Amino acid sequence: MTILIIAPAGASLRYRLCKLFYRPAGHLLLIYFLTWSAGLLAQGLPDLDGYSLEVALLLEEYHAESDDLGSMLPSIFAYQDNASAEMLIDFERGLISISAGNVGELKRAAVEILLTQVDPAVIDARTAQDLGLVNAKTQKPFLHAQVVDQDGSPIASAWRAGRYVDQLMARQAVSSPARLVIPMIVQHKAVASNKYLGFAKTASAKHMIPVALIMAIIETESSFNPLARSRSNALGLMQIKADTAGRDYFSVINGYSHTPTSAYLYDPANNVEVGTGYLSILADRYLAGIYHPQKLEYAIISSFNGGTGNLFKSLVPSGGRQAAIDRVNAMTVEEFYWFLTNRHIRVETMNYVRKVTALMAKYG
């Protein structure tokens, strides 16, 4: 099986392809998650005309190195349909890539991905037979307005999708075996974020967590991929681990012991509710005693990614909670932010704090 992977020319790339079998209403999806290097995450649309050689090199590299290990980036969603066409959505870079055995199959698959409703909130209503139809619940494709045609119009009909695919295939000189790249608009994340803003506002009002923080975490964790799954089994928009944050949520917020299912956490409303509830648990329980609200927010962000234990170990060698909190309270806001972004024991968490705090300005 071949998966088409798109990267800018000259990008440093490491990735591992892992499988998760997910069967909504009897339809088998093959969901893949890839590891990309930091150099791959530059924003903006690529020069599509220069991709054929790059794609071939990347495919060759994948077959040679597919057993390499690496941390997952959950912003990739891909599946293989019943006719063996392979479709991949990169929610971070805003690219859709499709691979098929011939031109006719490629066009069918491209039209399908532009029109299908793959939102997990309604995915259980889809079967293999109706894959490719606009879902009756929303009347709009999942990628509506994130992809526009050559007229700049959102794609919601088979006619418009087919015409746009024909134009792209001609531009990219598609031949057999057939591969096609469909770009999303530059502001695709802004369009995607609007789908989930209502959930964030509802959870914010319930748990007293800023909407900007919730949205910034969603973008950082999944790039608004509602079916995101990491190698460590963190799920959905906010990358919730069922047996840790999920269990804490049900125990503390709902008052009973329960581990949420994958299906539960793939539902966007549930995921945002559980994730936001867990942020409030961090604030009110694990990080209680940090008095300055801005320092508490920074501590919440770092702990959501790296855990409170690693935060405390970063602050004091013993990892003692009270000693760590006392040190936070003794710092200025600026000193604590500098510490988190320069002295935390996990480099990933240092970068995470920088990214989330920067994104909060966009949603504030």
Pin down the residues of each PLM region:
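Active-site metal-coordination segments of metallo-dependent hydrolases
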Residues: 188-191, 262-272
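Cell-wall glycan-active module
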Residues: 2-8, 12-22, 27-28, 32-219, ...
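Catalytic and binding regions of secreted/periplasmic enzymes and modules that target cell-wall glycans
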Residues: 271-320
